[in-house]
Amino acid sequence: MGTPFYCYSTATLARHYQVFAESFPEAKICFAVKANGNLAVLKTLAALGCGADVVSEGEIRLAIAAGISPSNIIFSGVGKTADEMRYALSQQIFQFNVESEAELLALNEV
């Protein structure tokens, strides 16, 4: 077996997510895709109702491929390009964490 090798437990991931979700029943939990973009991990979280916090078009594509609803995707991060904002909007992602007034104006232009 080559390295690196990653072994994930779906049962453990689901259990930890559910304990966290039960601790904060009013919160919408969004996993930071930058923390782990493994499609199997994202699919497991999506099946549990988890949303996604993304910072790039690539992460948007991963979240959608995993089955996370665009209505549960938040586009965060600094330096979003106009093309990335346009792509997010074309995918029906309407939750943006805007990092500056300039970014807000750029989003308004898109």
Q: Which residues are covered by each model-predicted region?
A:
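A charged N-terminal "starter" segment
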Residues: M1-V110
